[in-house]
Structures are given as C-alpha cells and as structure tokens.
Swiss-Prot record:
Pfam families: Ribosomal_L27A (PF00828). Part of the 50S ribosomal subunit. Disulfide bonds: none annotated. NCBIfam families: rplO_bact. GO terms for cellular component: cytosolic large ribosomal subunit. Keywords: Ribonucleoprotein, Ribosomal protein, RNA-binding, rRNA-binding. This is Large ribosomal subunit protein uL15. Residues 1-42 are annotated as: Disordered. One of its GO terms (molecular function) is rRNA binding. The keyword Ribosomal protein applies. Binds to the 23S rRNA. Belongs to the universal ribosomal protein uL15 family.
C-alpha cells in the first residue's frame, strides 16, 4: 500500500491546545500552578537579583580608559638583536629582518634602543626610538625612516 498526501496525519499527542491558566477553578484556576503566597506567586524577581546582597556588577571595579582601535601596532626589534643577528653589519632593511625571522612579513617595524650595538649598520625601518637612533649614529651607522 502506498502512502498518499491525504492519508498523512500528525502524530497522536503532538497537537494539543495550550492550557489557559487562571481561568476558572476547573482548569488550573485560582493560583494557576504557582502554589500559595510568596514572591513567586505574586511576581517574578529578575535572574540577576541576589536577594538584597550587593550585586556582582556593582562589587566589581569599573573599567578605566579604553582601547584605541586606530592604534598602529609595531613589531619591536632592539638594537641588541640587530648586533646579534647581523654581526657583520651593513645595510639592513625590513626584508632582511623578515629573512632572519626577527619579525613577521607585512608588519610595521620599530627599532628600540635596548642592548649594545658594536657594528656599523645602515638601517631602514618604519620608526626609531630616540635612544636607538643615538646608538646607531654613535656606532657610525645611519637610519632611514620608511
């Protein structure tokens, strides 16, 4: 026997009318399934209510400041790292730093002045700190901002 569209019926018990509570004593009237007396019988308290105790959102400190979405992030390379990675000195570009895996590709580079520089370097990067610029020039090198 084949099933046809006009033979289909919903499953038994799946189509029940919802019980209208509080509409007469015969069908969940009077207290409407809420029990007798108390806060829950009269109204509902918010989920966040902590019984009069100081709420968690008021106990925690407020956040100060904000995080600037327009801030430019720089990959940091110190002068000491440059003298370690390039002991022979010479001309160093951003691509050379990527090749030595000091930074990742497509990142802006800032050179900071931590460490000692003993070799003469000609460095090109996006930013230089004052101390890094000073140490490079004292060692006999030069800087170029991109």
């Amino acid at each position: 026997m084949t099933i046809k569209l006009h033979d289909l019926q919903p499953a038994r018990g799946s189509k029940t009318t919802r019980t209208r509570v509080g509409r007469g004593e015969a069908s969940k009237g009077k207290t409407a399934g809420r029990g007798t007396k108390g806060t829950k019988a009269r109204k509902q308290v918010p989920v966040t209510f902590e019984g009069g105790q100081m709420p968690i959102h008021m106990r925690l400190p407020k956040l100060k400041g904000f995080r600037n979405r327009l801030r430019t992030e720089y990959a940091v390379v110190n002068v000491g790292d440059i003298s370690r990675l390039f002991p022979e000195g010479g001309t160093i570009s951003v691509n050379d730093l990527v090749a030595k895996k000091a930074i990742r590709k497509n990142s802006l580079v800032k050179i900071l002045g931590d460490g000692k520089l003993t070799v003469k370097v000609t460095l090109s990067a996006h930013k230089f700190s004052g101390s890094a610029r000073h140490k490079i020039t004292v060692a006999g090198g030069s800087v170029t901002e991109l």
